[in-house]
Amino acid sequence: QQDGNWSLYLPDIEYQSRNGLETYNCTAFGTLNCIETLIRRKYGVIENFSERFTGIAAGTRPPGNSPHVVCDAIRDKGLIDERVLPFGSDIDIIDEYYSPYPLTAELLYAGKSWLDKWEFTHEWVVYPSTKNKQKELSDALRYSPIGVSVMAWRQNNDGLYTKEKGEGDNHYCTLYNYEQGEAWHIFDHYDNTNKKLIWNYDFGYAKRFSMKKIEVCINKPTFFDSLKNYFREIMK
């Protein structure tokens, strides 16, 4: 995506806090939004994966988790469709949300089936000590939407979200576009899902992703296989 703008491929809005329940599952929501956007852009497939499954697989509990742990859980346990393990209106207790724990054999099998079809990789783009974060992020946006850690949320008089240099982060979401020298565009999973951040926003951590569909190789019969099959047929 040479212009770094993934806005046409963003998934449907899903909130991490519903039914009066805060899930603390922002690392799963932010990561899956990036994955769903990337798959839609590369393969034209609209997916909606279960953040509950990913949170359980990653061992997420209040007050949250590391995006790196979440990504490694995806590489180990895969993903499943939201409809298989949804965040329904009946779930209003944290122990209900993060259940079943451990995951059932059926859910694990569904996740492993996804791994048979997709190759998922991830890598850090920005650390707190990274120099020229703006260049690193704008370059990385050519290849995927970016999972970013942020300090949620403080607005200035222009309606842009700000963060002082060195402030700690407490949230994780999706960076999907930028205006050079002006603002960063964020897709969030709280109210006001589309946010603009000041250009010199001091992101703490940022991670890019890669998705590749695994081609199923079907071995073609050799000449000798065909010959054996031919004689087998005529000898019947």
Residue ranges and their predicted role:
Residues 31-35, 169-172:
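Short, hydrophobic/amphipathic alpha-helical packing segments
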Residues 1, 235-236:
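Intrinsically disordered, low-complexity terminal tails
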Residues 1-27, 32, 38-60, 79-109:
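Active-site-adjacent structural segments surrounding the nucleophilic cysteine of cysteine proteases
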Residues 60-233:
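Predominantly the structural core of cysteine protease catalytic domains
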